[in-house]
């Protein structure tokens, strides 16, 4: 089974939300390694929120601020590749925006070869264009690696009808369609990512990634998180 895991940049950082936290990164490696060892083929799209925040770039034009963010995802991807390999895992980085020794251009034959050798695919640089989120990039890259499931790794155990951090009476919604999520105004992903999921027939699973073992449970079909399906 092929799966694209969407990680936020903040997932790599500690409580301060900046830079790289060794304990947090080691946790990510442990969770990803557990699913690779079970035979799942994994792709990853990571954000850059641990390196750059939109508010810090507010004096720039949006296009240039987005370009800085895209480069931040490359930095995070190179970091992850090194950590994965030092943990005994194979990993390859694909991007359309940079030419570095450790970064390959997106190539479908190369992606298939990497998956056959059980390499983790790390997709850097978003969609390669400004104005698109890493959510949209995750769906696009899932299609390129022929995955029909995107796992959105969050700190919340699924989709709720309102913010559970602000509203104690928030109710979890274990299963819904993209149209329902959009109609309810739920911010699971942005509208462009939703539209692409609907068009391509890709399912999104929202989980609390930081509950140990939840990723593996989700991929094995156990009742964790929330599932958003095409209409």
UniProtKB/Swiss-Prot annotation:
SUPFAM superfamilies recorded: Carbamate kinase-like (SSF53633)
Residue positions binding UMP: 66, 127-134
Involved in allosteric activation by GTP: annotated segments: 14-19
Enzyme class: transferase
Activity regulation description: Allosterically activated by GTP. Inhibited by UTP.
InterPro entries the record matches: AceGlu_kinase-like_sf (IPR036393), Asp/Glu/Uridylate_kinase (IPR001048), Uridylate_kinase (IPR011817), Uridylate_kinase_bac (IPR015963)
Keyword hit for NAD: no
A Pfam entry, by short name: AA_kinase
Enzymatic reactions: UMP + ATP = UDP + ADP
Cell compartments where the protein resides: Cytoplasm
Signal peptide: none
Biological-process GO terms, alphabetical: 'de novo' CTP biosynthetic process; UDP biosynthetic process
Pathway per the UniProt entry: Pyrimidine metabolism; CTP biosynthesis via de novo pathway; UDP from UMP (UMPK route): step 1/1
Annotated positions binding ATP: 6-9, 49, 53, 154, 160, 163
Cellular component GO terms held in the UniProt record: cytoplasm
Molecular function, one GO term: ATP binding
Keywords: Allosteric enzyme, ATP-binding, Cytoplasm, Kinase, Nucleotide-binding, Pyrimidine biosynthesis, Transferase
Record has Chaperone as a keyword: no
Assembly, per entry: Homohexamer.
Family of the protein in this entry: Belongs to the UMP kinase family.
PANTHER family named among the record's database cross-references: URIDYLATE KINASE, URIDYLATE KINASE PUMPKIN, CHLOROPLASTIC
Job of this protein: Catalyzes the reversible phosphorylation of UMP to UDP.
Name assigned to this protein: Uridylate kinase
């Amino acid at each position: 089974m092929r799966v694209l895991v969407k990680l936020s940049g903040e997932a790599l950082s500690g409580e301060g939300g900046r830079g790289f936290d060794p304990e947090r990164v080691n946790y990510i490696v442990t969770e990803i390694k557990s699913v690779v060892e079970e035979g799942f083929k994994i792709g990853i799209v990571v954000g850059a929120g641990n390196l750059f925040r939109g508010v810090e770039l507010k004096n720039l034009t949006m296009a240039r601020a987005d370009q800085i963010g895209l480069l931040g995802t490359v930095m995070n991807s190179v970091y992850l590749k090194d950590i994965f390999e030092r943990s005994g895992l194979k990993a390859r980085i694909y991007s359309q925006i940079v030419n570095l020794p450790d970064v390959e251009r997106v190539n479908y034959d190369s992606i298939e070869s990497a998956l056959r050798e059980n390499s983790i695919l790390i997709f850097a640089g978003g969609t390669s264009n400004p104005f698109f989120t890493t959510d949209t990039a995750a769906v696009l890259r899932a299609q390129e690696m022929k995955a029909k499931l995107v796992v959105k790794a969050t700190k919340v155990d699924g989709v709720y009808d309102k913010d559970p951090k602000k509203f104690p009476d928030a109710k979890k919604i274990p299963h819904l369609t993209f149209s329902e999520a959009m109609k309810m105004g739920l911010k699971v992903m942005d509208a462009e990512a939703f539209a692409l999921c609907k068009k391509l027939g890709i399912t999104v699973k929202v989980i609390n990634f930081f509950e140990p073992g939840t990723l593996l449970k989700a991929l094995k079909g156990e009742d964790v998180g929330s599932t958003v399906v095409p209409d």
